[in-house]
Amino acid sequence: MAIGNWTEISEFILMSFSSLPTEIQSLLFLTFLTIYLVTLKGNSLIILVTLADPMLHSPMYFFLRNLSFLEIGFNLVIVPKMLGTLLAQDTTISFLGCATQMYFFFFFGVAECFLLATMAYDRYVAICSPLHYPVIMNQRTRAKLAAASWFPGFPVATVQTTWLFSFPFCGTNKVNHFFCDSPPVLKLVCADTALFEIYAIVGTILVVMIPCLLILCSYTRIAAAILKIPSAKGKHKAFSTCSSHLLVVSLFYISSSLTYFWPKSNNSPESKKLLSLSYTVVTPMLNPIIYSLRNSEVKNALSRTFHKVLALRNCIP
């Protein structure tokens, strides 16, 4: 329905990787499908193992379980639709579908930032106050910290998504991305978005920088505590408990920061798609691999669980 020069848009078209040849898109489909399945299986396995094995009923693995839930949600929001655009060329997404995808993208993204900060604090308490660790990080405290990590996603996602989709859209309805991210959708708005853009920039900086500063503060104190440990074996053991989390934090923050804080003149739509893939598709797959390969407790728990499953199968006639 036309209103002046504005057109009421009922759906959007995700350009995804349509500029690439069909053969390349087919290859991308197989690649992303494999990554998607590995992500779901890997994170589901982390959840099941940390629940089933009594040795992993500590605060560290409680937060790791939360991270795995989050990564599964991230993948379910982004990847299925992207696979549809590559396989069946189903590039359309409804107005409500686009808003819903953007909402949950913001929700899971913000939650991950704060959850990574909470996990860093957990490591700080474990290394700097080992004797008081069970008391400080009791069941009630860890539940509160987890809730505090998930909660900020709700107001941020609600305000940003509701505000953006209250603007009128005109002209093209083509979103030059593989999902409904804020910057490419904002380009389709035919109204003054200066105030929204200021809010988005300030909000993004706060959401990224506050958890990042908390992580840096935690690891600065952790590093100081590790340096005071007299034995090399003790230092190695303390560092090994943090190395997996540090690697996960680095992957997430470097890729997301390059996407949203890199100068626009140096960041083409295609390069932004690649950067977005790193933290929406690749990082969720790598997290369970990093934690399982670099953590002996998780590896041992996986081995115990595997042997229990084999034993149960052998008992069944």
UniProtKB/Swiss-Prot annotation:
The keyword Transmembrane helix applies. It is a multi-pass membrane protein. One of its GO terms (molecular function) is olfactory receptor activity. Residues 1-26, 77-100, 162-198, 260-272 are extracellular. Glycans are attached at residue 5. CDD domains: 7tmA_OR10A-like (cd15225). The chain crosses the membrane at residues 27-47, 56-76, 101-121, 141-161, 199-218, 239-259, 273-293. Signal peptide: none annotated. It holds the Pfam family 7tm_4. InterPro entries: GPCR_Rhodpsn, GPCR_Rhodpsn_7TM, Olfact_rcpt. Expressed in the tongue. Residues 48-55, 122-140, 219-238, 294-317 are cytoplasmic. GO terms for cellular component: membrane; plasma membrane. GO terms for biological process: detection of chemical stimulus involved in sensory perception of smell; sensory perception of smell. SUPFAM superfamilies: Family A G protein-coupled receptor-like (SSF81321). Disulfide bonds join 98-190. The keyword GTP-binding does not apply. It is found in: Cell membrane. Keywords: Cell membrane, Disulfide bond, G-protein coupled receptor, Glycoprotein, Membrane, Olfaction, Receptor, Sensory transduction, Transducer, Transmembrane, Transmembrane helix. Belongs to the G-protein coupled receptor 1 family. Odorant receptor (Potential). May be involved in taste perception. This is Olfactory receptor 10A5. It comes from Homo sapiens.
